[in-house]
Structure formats: structure tokens, C-alpha cells
Amino acid sequence: ALPRGEYQLSQHVGGRCVYTFCMCPGGSVVAAASETGRAVTNGMSLHARDGENANAAVVVSVNEADFGGDARRAIAFQRELEARAYAAGGGGYAAPAENVRSFLEGAGTLYAGAVKPTYPRGVTACDLGSLLPGELTGALRAGLSAFERKLRGYTAPEAVLTGLETRTSSPVRLPRDENGESTDVRGVWPCG
């Protein structure tokens, strides 16, 4: 079994942060939609972590100005992105996907290479940047380029982006002891 992923990458781009989340060695990208007509991805590894690929979410922070400032608008914004992903996947819950280099160039291509998408419902080539507001796309492109400078090969031609993962948790860490209990608040066992 492979150990837990040891890297976390982050880059500040303007007023946003782009970061990797939940690196899964030997992992898969899986379907996580909970509503009809929406596509959502997530990543996971089985216990043995012996899958063909490794995967990590690449997340860009969303500001209140992106969605209009209140919780209802934030949820509507998320649902709109998920509906766009569903449509871009061609319906049937396939996910839109693109090679990383293609995303950086705005080309919208996906070719068969060393990295084979694991998404169980299938993938459809798509310009992922067209699914997001321009500010988010620009930040993701800048962040991925910075990640390549930090970790050579991160934007390798065969690397694949499968999306959209719209339901990440905040990058807050809750310290726990060896039994999983919070070290800050006794009697609380954070999970998730």
C-alpha cells in the first residue's frame, strides 16, 4: 500500500488561492452528483491505494463577488456550474475532461495517453475553461503553471483534468490526537 500523498501545492493569484486538495495515490475520480442533470466529481483511493493513477483536486477560491454575496446565490452558483458540467459531458452523467496542457492553452482537447481517466461514467473532451467564469479559469491556469515550477511534470502533456469538483471543504485543519480526538476541544472527534 502506498502512503498518504505527501504533497500539497498552493499559489496565490491576485485575490485568490489555488491549491491541491486530497491527493489520492493510486486513486480514482468518481461520480458524486446528488441531483438530476448535474455532474460532480470527487477523488478517492481504495485501502490498498494500488490503482493506476494518482489524483488530487485542484481548487480555486471563490469570492462573494463571484456569486452575488449571500448563501442562496452561492448555492445557485454551484448548481449552475454542475449543470454546465453535466451538459458539457453530453448528459448521462459523463464528466467533461481535458488534458492539462490543453486547458492551459484553452484548446479543449483530450487525447489517449499514459494517463487514462478513471471516471466510471465516462468522459467527454471539453474546454473546461469555458465552464467557469474567466477569473476562475485564469487563476487555475496561473496556479497550474506555478505548480509546474514547484513540481516538475505536474502539467505533463498526458495529465488529465476531470471536472468539475464543486463540493470541497475549506482548507481548515483540525488537529487530532492518536485516537482522533480534537487536541483543541476535548470530547470532540472531528470527522470528514
Where are these regions (language model features)?
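Residues forming the flavin
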Residues: A1-G192
